[in-house]
Amino acid sequence: MTALIHLNGPPGIGKSTLAARYADRHPGTLNLDIDTLHHLIGGWRTSQGQFHDLLRPLAWAMAGTHLADGRDVILPQYVCDLTQLQIFEQVAHDADADFIEIVLLDDRDAAIERFNSRDDGSEWTRHNNELVADLGGDEFLAGMYDRLLSLLDARPDALVVRSVLGAIDGTATALDRALETVRAQG
């Protein structure tokens, strides 16, 4: 069955990398990385430029259209707002698709360090690093991590996949196994 696969997790945990790999191995899958859509909205570089509220409705429409055509969508995006998550779930159900939640996790301190050590030289990464610093840096990231753990209590069907720094192949294999398990359960 067609599915909207939501890869949740703290910033820098590997969501985008794993989603891109998954989409490459599954032709026709839409890699709906919302962070790549920011460049389409004027003013995204400003520190006040928090455009997720503008982009999520676009993502819902894109996901719904792709799912309705019978194709999978993988969504690598940190989402801890229960209402936002439920909307993505409803988009999947409206298209007669499954909604599969995978949460990528590392230890809290390791997750924070992973965010702080990533630097691909891109304008987006610089912008994101500045934004996080302006919001409180490590303390802000720790709060994001803690909210994600709290969300898991409200989302018992979400599967946790351990994301280990430097072990992208192993994490990708663990993700594939988790998805196989969910799909086998139907």
Language-model features: where?
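Glycine-rich phosphate-binding loop used to anchor ATP phosphates in small-molecule kinases
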Residues: L54-A95, F99
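Conserved phosphate-donor/acceptor-positioning beta-strand/loop module used by diverse small-molecule
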Residues: A95-N116
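Pre-Walker A (Motif I) flank of P-loop NTPase domains
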Residues: M1-L4, R71
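P-loop (Walker A) phosphate-binding loop of NTP-binding proteins
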Residues: P10
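Hydrophobic anchor at the beta1->P-loop junction of P-loop NTPases
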Residues: L7
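Conserved substrate/cofactor phosphate-moiety recognition/catalytic segment
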Residues: I13-D69
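Small-molecule kinase domains that catalyze NTP-dependent phosphoryl transfer to phosphate-bearing small molecules
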Residues: D120-T171
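Conserved beta-strand scaffold positions in the cores of enzyme catalytic domains, especially
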Residues: N31, F99-E101, A158-R162
